[in-house]
């Protein structure tokens, strides 16, 4: 399962909650990947696409080893999310009605 939405919307909370109930689940958090693996990337569209490709690669390795990845990331590109859906990835968008949070996020990451 791939959860996506704005920062603070509850993606990690949902992953952690579901992780308790699914055997052999594995949490992949976009913030942790960015700080430990993708620290060389920024927040421009191309870098965010590279980040998603890296996460997808890690998730594929987990699936091949018999784990069930629960992924939490911030991502907004409809084309990429549609591509992920077309290959069978279950995407769940987590939304929170907060105009202020959205404005802060967009200003911080220039999106």
Tell where the protein language model's regions lie, with residue ranges:
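The conserved Walker
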Residues: 6-7, 12
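A short local structural element in Rossmann-fold oxidoreductases
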Residues: 38, 81, 102
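Short, glycine/charged-enriched secondary-structure capping and boundary segments
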Residues: 18, 41-43, 83-87, 106-108
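Conserved substrate/cofactor phosphate-moiety recognition/catalytic segment
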Residues: 12-60
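Hydrophobic anchor at the beta1->P-loop junction of P-loop NTPases
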Residues: 3
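Small-molecule kinase domains that catalyze NTP-dependent phosphoryl transfer to phosphate-bearing small molecules
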Residues: 95-111
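Glycine-rich phosphate-binding loop used to anchor ATP phosphates in small-molecule kinases
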Residues: 44-91, 95-98
């Amino acid at each position: 399962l791939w959860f996506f939405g704005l920062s603070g919307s509850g993606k990690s909370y949902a992953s952690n909650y579901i992780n308790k109930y699914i055997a052999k689940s594995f949490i992949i958090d976009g913030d942790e990947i960015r700080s430990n693996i993708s620290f060389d990337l920024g927040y421009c569209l191309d870098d965010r696409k590279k980040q998603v490709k890296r996460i997808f690669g890690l998730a594929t390795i987990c699936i091949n080893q018999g784990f069930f990845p629960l992924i939490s990331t911030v991502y907004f590109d409809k084309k990429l999310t549609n591509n992920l859906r077309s290959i069978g990835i279950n995407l769940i968008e987590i939304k929170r009605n907060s105009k202020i949070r959205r404005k802060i996020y967009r200003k911080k990451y220039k999106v």
